[in-house]
Amino acid sequence: AQIAGYVQSAQRQRGLHALVDVGGGTLDVVTFIVHERDGEDVFPFLVPEIRALGTQMLYQNRLVEAPEHEKSKLPDELQPVLNTLEYAKCTGLPEDHIALRDNVFWSEVHSTVHRVFHHTKRNRYRLSEAWTKGLPVFLTGGGGSVEGYQKSVKSGGLNCAPVMNLMLLPKHPKLADFSGTTSDYQRVSVACGLAQDAFSLGQLIPAGQVENDDNSLHRVADRPDRDELYAR
């Protein structure tokens, strides 16, 4: 639903893409294909993964084994995410402790992204041009503008593709009256996408119905022909 605006925009490209949605509680990562078959948009999903690595988890991680602190000084989780130095000044906690905990957290984000992209490249879409020319990655959600997530997404994918082309989701053409900024739209993109007519989204193919990119596997009955799903 989130990519509804993209597929109806001038930015649209065929082929492999990734979406990384940074919410309050979770980090959602998925690779998918933008394709068209018989005049209908088709979106095969390849590798989805959801981890408890959202912005609230980032803050909770900073308090693990932390020295005594005043809870009243903890920042409001509904406000923009504070970086290491800002968080230290706000809470009075040692900056080196927060930096250490942040390194642990960003390593987990890096590993999650790498795992999804590596599995996609090795088993799901080996011949995609994205592996040589660069992978388009939508980084969205309330935490998408946080530098740590941006760096971790880029580093997590660099062993798979030479460039991670981080992109913002464009507004849906039917939402011309949306008064917020492009950054604001990233926070509400799920709701905006779901508000569209379901038939306008095209055909969504769950990952479980898309065969691995491996000729040694026998075709599973009732699954779409993979040659019809993979953009060439």
PLM region spans:
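N-terminal phosphate-binding loop and flanking beta/alpha elements of the actin-like ATPase fold
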Residues: A1-G15, V146-G148, V153-C160, M167-L168
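Generic recognition of flexible, low-complexity loop/linker segments
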Residues: A4-Q8, G15-L19, T120-E129, G134-P136, ...
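Short, conserved secondary-structure transition motifs
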Residues: A1-V7, G54-Y59, P173-D177
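Phosphate-binding glycine-rich/basic clefts of nucleotide- and phosphate-handling proteins
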Residues: T31-S152, D213-D222
